[in-house]
Protein backbone atom coordinates (compact mmCIF):
# COMPACT_ATOMS: atom_id res chain seq x y z
CA UNK A 1 0.00 0.00 0.00
CA UNK A 2 2.82 2.38 0.77
CA UNK A 3 4.00 2.17 -2.84
CA UNK A 4 0.53 2.95 -4.20
CA UNK A 5 0.24 5.95 -1.87
CA UNK A 6 3.62 7.17 -3.08
CA UNK A 7 2.69 6.73 -6.75
CA UNK A 8 -0.73 8.35 -6.31
CA UNK A 9 0.79 11.37 -4.61
CA UNK A 10 3.38 11.70 -7.40
CA UNK A 11 0.54 11.77 -9.95
CA UNK A 12 -1.37 14.31 -7.88
CA UNK A 13 1.71 16.53 -7.79
CA UNK A 14 1.66 16.76 -11.60
CA UNK A 15 -1.50 18.86 -11.41
CA UNK A 16 -1.54 22.54 -10.61
CA UNK A 17 -4.21 22.05 -7.95
CA UNK A 18 -2.66 20.69 -4.79
CA UNK A 19 -5.36 20.16 -2.13
CA UNK A 20 -5.16 21.54 1.38
CA UNK A 21 -5.75 18.06 2.82
CA UNK A 22 -4.92 14.62 1.43
CA UNK A 23 -7.20 11.97 2.97
CA UNK A 24 -5.79 8.51 2.31
CA UNK A 25 -7.66 5.19 2.37
CA UNK A 26 -5.30 3.74 4.98
CA UNK A 27 -2.26 4.61 7.04
CA UNK A 28 0.25 2.84 4.79
CA UNK A 29 -0.92 4.79 1.75
CA UNK A 30 -0.65 8.00 3.75
CA UNK A 31 2.93 7.16 4.72
CA UNK A 32 3.83 6.56 1.07
CA UNK A 33 2.15 9.81 0.07
CA UNK A 34 4.05 11.70 2.76
CA UNK A 35 7.32 10.39 1.33
CA UNK A 36 6.44 11.67 -2.15
CA UNK A 37 5.27 15.05 -0.84
CA UNK A 38 8.44 15.57 1.18
CA UNK A 39 10.61 14.60 -1.81
CA UNK A 40 8.98 17.47 -3.70
CA UNK A 41 9.85 19.84 -0.88
CA UNK A 42 6.34 20.20 0.52
CA UNK A 43 6.05 20.71 4.26
CA UNK A 44 3.46 18.66 6.12
CA UNK A 45 1.14 20.09 7.49
CA UNK A 46 2.09 23.64 6.43
CA UNK A 47 1.76 23.10 2.66
CA UNK A 48 -0.58 20.11 2.75
CA UNK A 49 -2.16 18.14 5.59
CA UNK A 50 -2.26 14.32 5.39
CA UNK A 51 -4.54 11.86 7.15
CA UNK A 52 -4.74 8.09 7.20
CA UNK A 53 -7.31 5.56 8.21
CA UNK A 54 -6.67 2.51 10.40
CA UNK A 55 -4.96 3.70 13.55
CA UNK A 56 -1.90 1.51 13.04
CA UNK A 57 1.14 1.56 15.31
CA UNK A 58 3.15 2.95 12.41
CA UNK A 59 0.85 5.98 12.24
CA UNK A 60 1.75 6.74 15.84
CA UNK A 61 5.47 6.42 15.13
CA UNK A 62 5.19 8.65 12.04
CA UNK A 63 3.06 11.29 13.78
CA UNK A 64 0.27 10.67 11.26
CA UNK A 65 -3.25 11.91 11.98
CA UNK A 66 -5.52 8.91 11.54
CA UNK A 67 -9.06 7.66 12.05
CA UNK A 68 -9.18 4.52 14.17
CA UNK A 69 -12.05 2.04 14.08
CA UNK A 70 -11.78 -0.82 16.57
CA UNK A 71 -10.91 -4.07 14.75
CA UNK A 72 -13.42 -6.11 16.73
CA UNK A 73 -16.36 -3.89 15.83
CA UNK A 74 -15.31 -3.69 12.18
CA UNK A 75 -14.97 -7.48 11.99
CA UNK A 76 -18.23 -8.10 13.81
CA UNK A 77 -20.19 -5.86 11.46
CA UNK A 78 -18.54 -7.39 8.38
CA UNK A 79 -19.39 -10.92 9.57
CA UNK A 80 -22.95 -9.90 10.40
CA UNK A 81 -23.38 -8.39 6.93
CA UNK A 82 -21.93 -11.52 5.29
CA UNK A 83 -24.20 -13.88 7.24
CA UNK A 84 -27.26 -11.79 6.37
CA UNK A 85 -26.23 -11.79 2.73
CA UNK A 86 -25.83 -15.59 2.71
CA UNK A 87 -29.24 -15.98 4.35
CA UNK A 88 -30.77 -13.73 1.69
CA UNK A 89 -31.95 -11.18 4.22
CA UNK A 90 -29.28 -8.60 3.65
CA UNK A 91 -30.38 -5.03 4.15
CA UNK A 92 -28.42 -2.00 3.17
CA UNK A 93 -29.39 0.06 6.17
CA UNK A 94 -27.01 2.68 7.41
CA UNK A 95 -25.05 1.76 10.50
CA UNK A 96 -22.70 3.67 12.72
CA UNK A 97 -19.27 2.55 13.83
CA UNK A 98 -17.50 4.15 16.76
CA UNK A 99 -14.41 5.90 15.43
CA UNK A 100 -11.74 7.98 17.05
CA UNK A 101 -9.55 10.57 15.39
CA UNK A 102 -5.96 10.63 16.61
CA UNK A 103 -4.79 14.18 15.91
CA UNK A 104 -1.05 14.23 15.35
CA UNK A 105 1.65 16.18 13.50
CA UNK A 106 0.34 15.86 9.93
CA UNK A 107 -2.63 18.19 10.44
CA UNK A 108 -3.03 21.61 12.04
Where are the language model's segments positioned?
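Short beta->alpha junction loops
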Residues: 1-3
